């Protein structure tokens, strides 16, 4: 299946060709004026004929009775000319330049005769003069059962008025085709087949207005194919009613609206499939009661030639050469990513391809082939810091074609350090990071800062893991401090923080905010509150509840928004005067020895990865649950704390967590003791 972009390119070419072949507003206005004038004049002619008929009846029968009055009323109710209807291109809206055939059908009560045609032709110019000052030439064409009306002003238009009657159709539908004896045809009756064709055209116009006019791109494709039929002799036999049926079937059977380019391709597919060939599906005429083939007039050779031409056109469409099918010049490439319009001086003399450079120039810049005149544009258009692009994208706009080089890779396998460099105007900038992408981003920010551009860009670091983000600051010599990395504000009312940074979001201690908050309050749940913006500028808001308080964070992706929410919670609850009161509360169960509390703290310190558990004392409550403690063998309780343990002996080296005499329930116990030199076991009892 072709991509949407190729269909969009086809749409551009089809619509450009359609604008070329579509009539000008002056031509459409002239068509409307001419058709409206002739319709009004024919109505005046109908009234004049009825008046003449009534006058003859009155002169032929001066004595009137009730029966004659009734008959005259019936004659007045049934006029000689019943009405005028638009058919063909005017009714269907398929007019194109150099192909503006205007047709009307004048319906008569009785079968039209040559005498009636002459009467209308003689009186029509007189009625036209009463309506408009413009002159029209009216010619009588008995062979075609019609009148030809030509305009005298530019553009030159020709309107064909065909006389017909519904009696021809009724006569065809009668069994045997026997006409009523009382109704005899006039001797100068007009051509029967021409009148039947006019009635068929009237049915075609009504069917087209009901079925094809509502289909998207159907009328546009029909105008394009009508132009193709005029240009290519092979397609001339398909012009008209069969072409309209094929387009309606091809476009109407799709389960979704089609663009102009895709609709044209679908019609070509139906023709290339072999619909017209003998033994194919054929083309049924929906406006006939009996099964009728709309392609019965075409020969086998003509069908094969049209099928072959459609197959060739379909190949051209598949290879993006629709301009050859339409016989037009290819349109210039329409690049959606080009956001800036070039000036007239830059546009003149420019070509689609990059000019050939033989290297004879004295410039020593290796990137001269890739540079563009963006410096003038950036000087005229200041950089918007709110634009959703990171530092790498912005530097690529300012200086396209920069070459980033990997200088070195150091560190262990599990924690490598990459050093990237870039040369800008003879100055080499270097930066390190835990990955090539991060190092490249850091050196880009460094270059932008050196050039004096603001660096408050949104950066998408989805590919970086949280561990990589938290470790990168400790390993990178050129990493920025937390005060320069984090540019945001926390609101005390709604506890919302939005961080805009070019690197990973870190706390003051150099850790990931989510990890540090998880150390202080485990089991937190982050929820997505809202998601806004388009596909190129997303905005996510995450919320987390800590100690019955809700904190929100916003960012270009969920990970950044989550880190922003965690950072807001840390700044509100664990910074400044609230840091001591809101530290993580580890409830130590009641043990059978004070030594066990200290030993357990030491064990926790030995197990943790640099997390010193002895930084604060363990809170011992009076309601704590009992748990066993650990006492090194060979040590007596009385030797460690005789002021506490004397008189409170317990079997199996267990003792109470607190002495018998009263002490505060929330007292912090800081025992002074000597720990054994041998290793502490790697387990704890809480």
Curated annotation (Swiss-Prot):
Annotated region (Disordered) at 339-368, 464-498
One annotated GO molecular function = single-stranded RNA binding
Q: Where in the cell is it found?
A: Cytoplasm
Q: Which residues cross the membrane?
A: none
All copies of domain DRBM, residue ranges: 387-453, 509-575
Keyword DNA-binding listed:
yes
Basic and acidic residues biased stretches: 345-368, 466-476
What Gene3D superfamilies does the database record attribute to this sequence?
Answer: 1.10.1410.40, 3.30.160.20, Beta Polymerase, domain 2
Q: Where is the composition biased (Low complexity)?
A: 477-491
- Write the record's keywords in alphabetical order, separated by commas: Cytoplasm, Developmental protein, Differentiation, DNA-binding, Repeat, RNA-binding, Spermatogenesis
| Residue span, DZF domain | 5-360
A cellular component term (GO) from this record? Answer: precatalytic spliceosome
Q: What are the GO BP annotations of this UniProt entry?
A: cell differentiation; spermatogenesis
* Superkingdom of origin: Eukaryota
Q: Does the keyword Metal-binding apply?
A: no
Q: What does this protein do?
A: May be involved in spermatogenesis and sperm function. Binds to double-stranded DNA and RNA.
Entry protein name: Spermatid perinuclear RNA-binding protein
Which organism encodes this protein?
Xenopus laevis
What gene name is given for the protein in this entry?
A: strbp
